[in-house]
Structures are given as C-alpha cells and as structure tokens.
Amino acid sequence: MTGHPPSAAPVPHAAPTTVRDAVIDLLRQFGIDRVFGNPGSTELPMFRDFPADFQYVLGLQEAVVVGMADGYAQATGNAAVVNLHSAAGVGNAMGNLFTAFKNRTPMIVTAGQQARAILPFDPFLGATQAAEMPKPYVKWSIEPARAQDVPAAIARAYRIAMQEPRGPVFVSIPVDDWDQPADLLPPRDVSRVVRPDPAALARLGDALDAARRPAFVIGAAVERAGAWQQAVQLAERHRARVYVAPMSGRCSFPEDHPLFAGFLPAIREKIVARLDGHDLIFAFGAPAFTYHVEGFGPHVPPGATLVQLVDDPGVAAWTPEGDAVVGNLRLAALDLLARAAPPERPMPEPRAPRTRAQPPAAGERMSAAFALQTLADVRDAHDIVIEEAPSARPVMQDHLPFTQSGTFYTMDSGGLGYGMPAAVGVALAQPGRRVIGLIGDGSSLYSIQALWSAAQLRLPITFVILNNVRYAALQDFAPVFGFGPDDPVQGTDLPNLDFVALAAGMGCRGGRVSDAARLRGTLVDALRAPTPVVVEIEIA
C-alpha cells in the first residue's frame, strides 16, 4: 500500500459540436424537418447519424427533387431544404430551379463539393466555381471560405430566401466540412415583410378612389402573401372588375365571384383590347405585363392610367409606365381598406355564364373541355390541383374554376417538369387533403419519376394525364410564327406512349379512359383512393 491518494477517474470530454450538429440545430430553429434530395458521395457525411425526427424525401432525379421541394415550400409557406450532388446534380435540377425562382419559392439548395484539400487538383466530382453555377436564378449563392462558416451561411441563406420577394438560395458545401468543429448559432428573429411607403400608398389609394371604371389585374403574389381575403374586399369596395394576370401561377381571386372577369392572355394587343373601357388599371401583385410573343403599341388602353402594387422592386423597375408601390401586399391591402370609403359606383356587368362542354359523338375522342368539366363536376372545391397541361390551360380556365384559396398551383416559368413532383410536395405539406396532378402527356415525361416518390410515400394523389399524343401547345402556337394550317411542326408528335404501364413500373395503380361514358366513374374512384392513382384520359 502506498502513501499516495487514489487518482480520480478521468472525466470524459463532451464531443465537440460539428458543422453537422450546428446545421441540424439551425434547421430545427427554422421549423424544418425534411430534406429533399438524391444523394451522392459528396453528400453522404451530411446524413451520417441523421436525426430520427427528420425525414429524407428521395427523388430519383434532381429535377424531381427540386419540384417536390417547390410544391412543399409553397404549400407550407416555409423554406424547403434541398440537397443535390455536386455540379452534375445542380445541372440536372436547373430547369426546376429556374421555375422555383420564377415561382418566388423559398428554398435552400445545398450541393456537395469535393474535399477542400484536393480542390486545387481538379478532382473527380469537383465543382469549378460552384457558387456561380446556379446564377442568376438564385437570390444568393456562396461556397463558404471555411468549414466553420457553413452554419452562418445556412442561416443567412434561410433569411434571404424568406425575405420578400422570396426565392431559392444556394450553398456549396465541401464533403469534409461536416465533421469539422463549429459553434451553435443563437436563435434570432428577423422580420420578413416591409410595409409600403405610406405617402406612395396614399397616392395609389387616391387614384383608386377617383377612378370611374377601375380594373384589377391580380397576380400570384397576392395568394403568396396571404392576401386573398383582402383582395376580395378591396375589389368589392371599389366595385372593380377583376382579371387574372397573364401566366399567373396561383389562384388569387375566387373564379365564381360576380366581379371576376376572366384571364388576360400574354399578348400585348389582346390585353389592351380586354381592358378597353377601364380608366384605371391596378396591377395588384402582378407584373404589368407578362408577354409571350412580340407586340406593339400601348401597354394599356389609350386614356387609361396604370398603377401597380408589388412586393418585388425588380418588377416595379421594369414596368414600362405608371406609378408603382413596393411592399408587402397584405399589409398594403389592409392599409387601403382602412381608408375612408370611396364614392359609390355601379356594379359592373357580370361575366357571361360558362357554357358546358358536350360529350363526343360516337367514335370520336372526347375533348379536353369535356374531360376537365367532368373533373370539375366530381372534384371537391377544397381539393388541390397542380396543373402542367399548357395546351389545356385556356380550356381549364373555362371549365375547371377555382373558388378557394390554396387550391391551385402551376409554374410561373413556362418550363416543363414541375407539375408531377410539385404535386408530391404539396401532398406532403397538406396531409389529409386530396391532391390532383393535372398533367399533359408531354409534360409528364420530364419528371415521370415523381410517381415512384408518390408511391413510396403512399400519398393520396390523383394524377390525371391528358393524352392527346402530341405537344399540342406547340402545334397550336405554330401559326403565330407563320406556319400554315397543314404545315408539319417537327418534333411535336408523341405516339406509342403507355402511361398505365409507366405508372405500374413506378409502383402506382393506373387506368386508361377512352370512353367518355366511363370517365366520371373512373375519376370518382380515383379521387377516393388512399394512395396515388394515374388516370390516363385519351383526348382529341
């Protein structure tokens, strides 16, 4: 026995906080518990010891991943987190990243990068100038200078994504950063909306009050700002006809309202003709205007004044005439509604009633109008529709009305491949709600892999594919560019596609309808199914 006292047992040191720990902690602060991705080797360390309270949502191709995240973020109102595989994955995702930018969707896109130690040697899977690749279709982009800067970059990215106008942001993260030490970041409250300048808004209100026959042109930003109710109240207060802005990606006004006047085309001369007779054009949450083809002449009818209220200073800057006010649309509308009542005006004449489409004659394919009218007849007004059927959109606007907030999504970009994965994201965000993916045959093939994700997640989605065996939008548009009625339009025919077989290959039940008499029953059954179903409708 010695005279020395026994030594104390060594105290174990707590494991240092890593970049991974700090980022997961941040995501919890932001209310984010899902990551949408398609993993590669440069991303694997991010997901080691993946938290049990998080869900990884797998897409089989990166365009599907971004599309799912887009629908999810729009439906929740919070930013979605996306993880892509280095430069190749970002390249695959760029089409839907462009759409997310145009949709003003808050999204944190992360991409793996090779280890910092080998970046000087142009390594396999290394991304050269990684932060430049997604520009200009992100609000902010960075590859942090040090591993310990990654959490701060994620925090900054989230706050930028959530500031109006919202949009995607990009962070490139080297593979060896995740295990490096980093500090946890404290919670911070950063406001996301800005009230418009009171004097400028007062002048806009004066113009509305003084108008004799005002017209509202309402865009998707109204719905994104949660200003649906205020838009209705403002239109009723001013007894103004309400038109939907060209190419609007959301429904911002009930289409059964007596003041609803229909949809504006994306053609300058036709917009002017539709708005003729109004002395004030109020672009509310909308560009003035989105055009699809070249046009000439005035942007609004002669003698009419244009005023605009938007949340995007960039949109206000390029608007060719009239005064613009920039700020949060809901706060602005509340301020306008708080003004003294304007002079009494007569109610405008209501829009002519919609005509009903007729069933096809014996031996003929049914029309898109009949198919969509039948869908409208069996669909609950609360059901959510994600549409990507460009040639059928004008028909949809006549035969499939939307009357409730949060029930319609499409892409503001014109790029295909958004609709099917967005339906998956919306269904994830709205458990218990019926989601309908209304997709064209050509559109569906840009992201058909979304069916697999829907099947794996067992989501109640009814995919309605309108099969007209062609890119009908291009064939219908060809005369604008000088094609004759019998001139072939190269690359627009799509024969021999079997969407029921494609659905089965992805794990989804499917059925084909060519007989108009069977359509209603087939849709009713599909809309009751607890898991995804594909209904292929053969149309003319």
Model-derived segments and spans:
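Phosphate/pyrophosphate-binding active-site segments
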Residues: T2-A15, Q148, L184, P302-A389, ...
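N-terminal cationic-hydrophobic initiation segments that often serve targeting/anchoring roles
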Residues: A73, A161, A235, A376-R379, ...
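N-terminal alpha/beta PP-like core and its mobile active-site loop of ThDP/TPP-dependent enzymes
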Residues: T2-A340, A381, P460-F463, F481-F483, ...
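Generic recognition of flexible, low-complexity loop/linker segments
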Residues: Y158, R203-G205, Q230-A231, E269-I271, ...
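Active-site diphosphate/adenylate-binding microenvironment
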Residues: R20-D33, N38-S41, M46-R48, P350-G432
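Thiamine diphosphate
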Residues: T110, I118-G126, A266, A317, ...
